[in-house]
């Protein structure tokens, strides 16, 4: 899928400027596809007045398309930050964790899209459970980058972009989890009852002043 292709690209860890530009350009395709799907879904509801399973399929497809479109937006934001970080350069050790986190998010996204294709609720629930791993990794990366900024204020600008890139990857995992929950709803007609785990522990941590605002 176009969304999956966006996250196969490791523009951040490779500091690949041209690849980052390509990711930004590809977001337009995702936006257009999402709009087209939504228009078709609304037209189908108006003309055929589907019920039960058929209606859930249509409503679910709208939800999933919205999550994929948002994932595209997050990918575009990461790509723009690659362009900014490219000017500063970044230590390899800081990007390895982010690269691994991105691989986890990509695997999560691939698995949830596969489970949508097969309507496999067990696989969708497994994807949902794995979101904790991405949350835990994000918290670890946050601490590492925060320490790096405190040790040398000259690192603040580059590390801020890396921080927000990591947060965007964590949010991609959240959207994959949303898709998993939608798949469960499509197949069963019920919402998953247990509360989603919340693994982000960074809200109690304090950023350096210059790094506190997203751009």
Identify the function of each model-found stretch:
Residues 39-66:
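Hydrophobic/aromatic-rich structural module bridging two neighboring secondary-structure elements via a short loop
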Residues 37, 41-44, 48, 82, ...:
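Leucine-rich amphipathic alpha-helices with coiled-coil/heptad-repeat character
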Residues 19, 23-26, 33, 57, ...:
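Amphipathic alpha-helix face/heptad-repeat signature
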Residues 11-32, 47, 80-84, 104, ...:
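Acidic (E/D-rich), amphipathic helical modules within compact regulatory domains
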Residues 2-7:
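Short, small-residue-biased leader/transition segments that mark boundaries at the very start
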Residues 15, 26, 33, 37-40, ...:
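Heptad-repeat coiled-coil/leucine-zipper interface motif in alpha-helices
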Residues 8-9, 65-86, 112-116, 124-128, ...:
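A structural feature that tracks compact, well-ordered secondary-structure segments
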Residues 49-50, 55-59, 89-110, 117, ...:
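Divalent-cation-assisted or electrostatically stabilized phosphate/pyrophosphate-binding catalytic cores
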């Amino acid at each position: 899928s176009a969304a999956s292709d966006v996250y196969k690209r490791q523009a951040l860890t490779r500091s690949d400027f041209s690849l980052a530009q390509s990711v930004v350009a590809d977001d337009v395709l995702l936006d257009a596809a999402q709009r087209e799907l939504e228009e078709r879904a609304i037209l189908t509801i108006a003309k055929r007045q589907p019920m039960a399973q058929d209606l859930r399929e249509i409503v679910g497809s709208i939800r999933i398309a919205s999550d994929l479109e948002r994932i595209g937006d997050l990918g575009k934001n990461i790509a723009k930050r690659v362009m900014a970080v490219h000017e500063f350069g970044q230590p390899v050790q800081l990007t390895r964790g982010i690269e691994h986190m991105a691989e986890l998010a990509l695997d999560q996204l691939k698995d949830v899209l596969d489970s949508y294709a097969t309507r496999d609720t067990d696989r969708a629930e497994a994807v949902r459970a794995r979101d904790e791993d991405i949350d835990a990794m994000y918290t670890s990366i946050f601490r590492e980058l925060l320490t790096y900024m405190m040790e040398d204020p000259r690192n603040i600008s580059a590390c801020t972009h890396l921080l927000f890139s990591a947060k965007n990857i964590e949010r991609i995992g959240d959207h994959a989890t949303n898709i998993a929950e939608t798949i469960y709803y499509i197949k069963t007609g019920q919402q998953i009852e247990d509360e989603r785990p919340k693994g982000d522990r960074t809200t109690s941590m304090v950023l350096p002043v210059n790094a506190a605002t997203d751009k």
